[in-house]
Design a protein with these regions (language model features):
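N-terminal export and membrane-targeting signals
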Residues: 1-12, 131-138, 156-170, 194-198, ...
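Hydrophobic alpha-helical transmembrane segments of multi-pass membrane transport/permease proteins
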Residues: 2-32, 139-149, 234-238, 290, ...
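A local structural motif
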Residues: 34, 50-59, 191-192, 196
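Extracytoplasmic loops/domains of multi-pass membrane proteins
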Residues: 43, 50-124
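Membrane-helix interface and discontinuous TM-entry motifs in multi-pass inner-membrane proteins
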Residues: 76, 112-151
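Transmembrane alpha-helical segments that form the functional core of multipass membrane systems
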Residues: 134-242
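Membrane-spanning alpha-helical segments of multipass transporters and channels
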Residues: 198-324, 339-341
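Cationic, amphipathic, low-complexity alpha-helical segments enriched
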Residues: 326-329, 334, 338-342, 350-355, ...
Length: 365
């Protein structure tokens, strides 16, 4: 018992250390890295900024092309050099902290080079989401809820996979998405009511992808699948989600996060709220693959292969033995009954018990 307790606490310490390592390394600096940034021409201001800030400059023909790219959620900002003055376009909805760094860097460079600069804000953040953190906050209940749904369903049914698990988890995802949407939208006012219906299928997909994928891991790996899902989806995937902006993460975390649902979930919600649902094809495909793959594994293996039972009671061996013993006892004649005594007294001439045998008894002489 003590060894099991120490082993369990040791596993928790490992997970805690891993969570601290992932989260701090991902969120510690919050500086722009390989950030897509549009330009419409050469400028010494842009050269000065790119020497200090990691920007991936993309050339566009004119301002209208830049605005179209921003509307597609492809740029964090743009610089438009002019004859008398230049224009800096910032996009707070893409990343609030990214906007702060971009505006400060270009403001300092333009001031040093004595270049007049006008700052233009596109896709501003509303008062009820001044830091743009709603998309990241909405991920937490959907992610944790989907994970807990798979874990508690396994614990309640002691069944790692079954065809009806898919229907139950999808039903949970639907109800949970409706509740989350009602609370965050009309209830608290984290976004306007006209986003209620566009966000509802997104919430369902996010919760279902996590729940079904978690159930699939449990079916394939066994009880350790629960621990595996917590490690991959919550500790690693959550650290690389990019709630403050994907471009603010280190490069390796940007690539790691692209493999797991949390980063795509935040991108999906953010683009639906602030970018009219543009550039959501990739998040929909990734989340859909997790949901579809998990559902197929849970449903198919639950139907075609014997279902693994977790924590099933041991077979009742003792009652079987007792039953057999009872039958053997009942099959013996009851010598103490009156009928048995009458039968023994009537047949004493033909049968004697071993104790009454004179040949076997000791001599009394």
């Amino acid at each position: 018992m003590v060894k099991k307790a120490l082993a369990a606490l040791g596993i928790v310490l490992v997970l805690q250390s891993l969570f601290a390592l992932c989260l701090v390394s991902a969120m510690q600096l919050l500086v722009l890295r390989n950030t897509p940034f549009g330009v419409t021409g050469a400028s010494p201001v842009v050269n000065a900024v790119t020497s200090k800030v990691s920007l991936e400059t993309l050339a566009y023909a004119d301002e209208s092309a830049v605005m179209e790219a921003i509307g597609q959620s492809k740029l964090h900002g743009a610089y438009l050099p002019g004859q008398a003055s230049d224009t800096l376009i910032v996009v707070p909805a893409k990343s609030f902290f990214g906007r702060v760094e971009i505006e400060a860097a270009f403001g300092d460079a333009a001031k040093k080079l004595e270049r007049p600069l006008t700052v233009k804000t596109v896709k501003p953040l509303p008062e009820y989401d001044r830091l743009g953190g709603v998309s990241g906050l909405l991920l937490i209940p959907l992610l944790i809820g989907g994970y807990l749904a798979a874990v508690l369903l396994l614990k309640a049914t002691r069944t790692a996979a079954a065809p009806w698990h898919v229907a139950m988890l999808v039903g949970y995802a639907t109800v949970g998405a409706v509740l989350t949407d009602l609370i965050a939208g009309p209830g608290i006012g984290a976004y306007t009511n006209d986003h209620f219906w566009p966000l509802l299928p997104c919430f369902i997909l996010i919760a279902a992808s996590v729940a079904l994928a978690a159930a699939a891991f449990q079916r394939l790996i066994g009880p350790l699948g629960t621990l595996e899902v917590a490690t991959l989806f919550i500790i690693v995937g959550g650290s690389a989600a990019g709630g403050v902006g994907i471009s603010l993460l280190p490069d390796y975390w940007q690539h790691i996060g692209a493999v797991f649902p949390p980063q795509h979930a935040i991108t999906l919600v953010r683009n639906v709220i602030y970018f009219d649902g543009n550039s959501i094809t990739t998040p929909l495909i990734v989340l859909g693959l997790y949901a579809l793959g998990g559902g197929v594994i849970v449903g198919y293996l639950g139907r075609r292969r014997p279902v693994k039972m977790v924590g099933a009671p041991a077979p009742a061996v003792a009652p079987v033995r007792l039953t057999r013993l009872t039958r053997l006892t009942q099959s013996k004649p009851r010598s103490h009954s009156p009928r048995a005594r009458r039968h023994s007294s009537g047949s004493s001439s033909r049968w004697r018990s071993p104790r009454s045998c004179s040949a076997c008894s000791p001599s009394t002489t």
